[in-house]
């Protein structure tokens, strides 16, 4: 993918595109991983507490 120019230097455009694609893929993988972990979380709610005090039942 990376091509050498006649003077032996890397083609800067190809190098930047390759690095950019790798960064995009890394961000995509982290995003997918985070989303999968979020969907695996089981959300629960606490049951309502019974109030045994008569002062609030008016």
From Swiss-Prot:
Keywords, alphabetical: Cell membrane, Membrane, Transmembrane, Transmembrane helix
Source species, domain of life: Bacteria
Primary localization class, coarse: membrane
Location relative to the cell: Cell membrane
UniProt membrane topology term: Single-pass membrane protein
InterPro entries the record matches: YtzI-like
Gene Ontology CC terms: plasma membrane
Record-annotated membrane-spanning stretches: 12-32
Name listed for the protein in its UniProt record: Uncharacterized membrane protein YtzI
Organism: Bacillus subtilis (strain 168)
Gene transcribed to yield this protein: ytzI
